[in-house]
Amino acid sequence: MSIFNLTEEKMKGTSSTFTAHEIYQQPATWRKTCAQLAACKDELQAFIDQVVKQDDFDIVLTGAGTSEFVGNSLFQALNPKYDFKVKSYASTDLVPSPENFLSRTKPTLLVNFGRSGNSPESLGNVEAAEVVCQNLYHLFAVSYTHLRAHET
C-alpha cells in the first residue's frame, strides 16, 4: 500500500505510518460524520436547545490533539451564531484546572471530541466538569462518527 507516494516500508522507517494513515482517512471520516449529523439533526437540536434557550449559557468545545483542532475549527462558525458564548479549550488545559474555564452556575454544554470516548483526556473532561458545573449537559462526539447526548 502507498499513501502520499510513500510505501509502507518507507513510512515504517520514518515512524510516519500512524500519522499518514490518520491524515489519509480524514475525508471519509468527515463524510460519515456529516451524514450522521444530518440523520439525527432534530434530536441533536432539541438537546442543544435545552441549553441555548436559557437566558445565559456556555458551550464548551474540548478535545486533545486533532480532537482539539475539531473544536477550534467549529468555534469559528459557532461562536457568532450563539451570541459569543462558545469557548474552545484543550483537554490538557481544562482537566487540571476546570474552575479557570467553567462556570459553576451557568448552564453549560460540554462538547467532548475524542477518538474513543474512553481516553484519559475524555474521561478527565467529564469528571472535571461534573465537579465544577452544577447545570451540565454533555455531548460526546466519539471518533467523529458516533454522537451521544447526556444531561447530568
Regions found by a protein language model. Give the residues of each.
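Cofactor-/ligand-binding subdomain signature composed of acidic, glycine-rich
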Residues: 1-46, 50-53
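Glycine-rich phosphate-binding loops that contact phosphosugars or nucleotide phosphates
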Residues: 53-148
